[in-house]
UniProtKB/Swiss-Prot annotation:
This is Peptidyl-prolyl cis-trans isomerase D. Identified in ESR1 or NR3C1/GCR steroid receptor-chaperone complexes. Found in HSP90 chaperone complexes with kinase clients LCK or EIF2AK1. Two monomers associate with one HSP90 homodimer. Interacts with HSP90AA1. Interacts with HSP90AB1; PPID and FKBP4 compete for binding to HSP90AB1 and the interaction is mutually exclusive with the PPID:HSPA8 interaction. Interacts with HSPA8; PPID and STIP1 but not FKBP4 compete for binding to HSPA8 and the interaction is mutually exclusive with the PPID:HSP90AB1 interaction. GO terms for cellular component: cilium; cytoplasm; cytosol; nucleolus; nucleoplasm; nucleus. GO terms for biological process: apoptotic process; cellular response to UV-A; chaperone-mediated protein folding; lipid droplet organization; negative regulation of transcription by RNA polymerase II; positive regulation of apoptotic process; positive regulation of protein secretion; positive regulation of viral genome replication. It comes from Mus musculus (Mouse). It is an enzyme of class 5 (isomerase). Pfam families: Pro_isomerase. It catalyses: [protein]-peptidylproline (omega=180) = [protein]-peptidylproline (omega=0). The gene is Ppid.
Length: 370
């Protein structure tokens, strides 16, 4: 008979803990820390632990190192799970256990009754190898068929980020890889806090912070702190790091909005809007014109009459040489703030660009029919 998955994290302080450092598209996203249920499924837990450390050498079946390092998450299905562990073929057809190609289903003690559970992928009964999946929702149809052998105790936000990557079918469009992995011993740093020298003392994902997400005052304090760090990076023209900090603010704000009353959400809106606009400004500096436009559209969803969003969106259109679109946005901005000199100057500049473009076209046609 299957049991409900453990509520405590960890469920047993003596169980081993392992970690994955995850990269998406060559960029570090964060760390997932997992507890392995060695007290319930010792053989399955030991297989996974050893594959995290790489201590067992080379596989007898694959001829490849028995190690998850460099192994991709090859299959992602939103509102279901993320799957990895094929270290040999990297596409779901390979891998092997530390005991040989396959080993038996140890037991089905725990149910797949929530997100963040670690379970063995298989090709039928008693075909466990190295492939695994992490649930992102309850998956009761897998009970009695797949062995639940661990849980995410930190880094659920990283798993959710993986869940939401763009896919072609079930294959991630960007390479999602376990860049580093290993075992965490008693007293080891779990690596949840940033080490970028910025003074940021907050976990990258709010799920890992020991805070009450319903405490709006606390969320605002953290958000202001992170925004200020982002502003420091902006001033030093480190656009990518600035974007990371502004995006982190939005994660904290969105997580809080999901659990608070509607009346309190408006208190978080100004800082969220400011950070979305700042992300747009960074993207303009990076010549990521479409990205800047997308950020400004997000800001305009929050505040349809925001002139800063319209102005920056117009700059994005100019980067794409879509001057008529830029003109339309600047005219809207001028209607809202008729006395704004920056908008007036930008409007004049765009009109001159449109005229120059038309003059150039006329000259081309004149040559053609001369």
């Amino acid at each position: 008979m299957s049991h409900a998955s453990p509520a405590a994290k960890p469920s047993n302080s003596k169980n081993p803990r392992v970690f994955f450092d995850v990269d998406i598209g060559g960029e570090r996203v964060g760390r997932i820390v997992l507890e392995l249920f060695a007290d319930i499924v010792p053989k399955t837990a030991e297989n996974f632990r050893a594959l995290c450390t790489g201590e067992k050498g080379t596989g007898s079946t694959t001829g490849k190192p028995l190690h998850f390092k460099g192994c991709p998450f090859h299959r992602i299905i939103k509102k279901f799970m993320i799957q990895g562990g094929d270290f040999s073929n990297q596409n779901g057809t390979g891998g092997e256990s530390i005991y040989g190609e396959k080993f038996e289903d140890e037991n089905f003690h725990y149910k797949h009754d929530r997100e963040g559970l670690l379970s063995m992928a298989n090709a039928g009964p008693n075909t466990n190898g190295s492939q695994f999946f992490i649930t992102t929702v309850p998956t009761p149809h897998l009970d009695g068929k797949h062995v639940v052998f661990g849980q995410v105790i930190k880094g659920l936000g990283v798993a959710r980020t993986l869940e939401n990557v763009e896919v072609n079918g079930e294959k991630p469009a960007k390479l999602c890889v376990i860049a580093e992995c290993g075992e965490l011993k008693e007293g080891d740093d779990w690596g949840i806090f940033p080490k970028d020298g910025s003074g940021d003392s907050h976990p990258d994902f709010p799920e890992d912070a020991d805070i009450d997400l319903k405490d709006v005052d606390k969320i605002l304090l953290i958000s202001e702190d992170l925004k200020n760090i982002g502003n420091t990076f902006f001033k030093s023209q480190n656009w990518e790091m600035a974007i990371k900090k502004y995006a982190k603010v939005l994660r904290y704000v969105d997580s809080s909005k999901a659990v608070i009353e509607k009346a309190d959400r408006s208190r978080l809106q100004p800082i969220a809007l400011s950070c979305v606009l700042n992300i747009g400004a960074c993207k303009l500096k990076m010549s990521n014109w479409q990205g800047a436009i997308d950020s400004c559209l997000e800001a305009l969803e929050m505040d349809p009459s925001n002139t800063k969003a319209l102005y920056r969106k117009a700059q994005g259109w100019q980067g794409l040489k879509e001057y008529d679109q830029a003109l339309a946005d600047l005219k809207k901005a001028q209607e809202i703030a008729p006395g704004d000199k920056a908008i007036q100057a930008e409007l004049l500049k765009v009109k001159q660009m449109i005229k120059a473009q038309k003059d150039k076209e006329k000259a081309v046609y004149a040559k053609m029919f001369a």
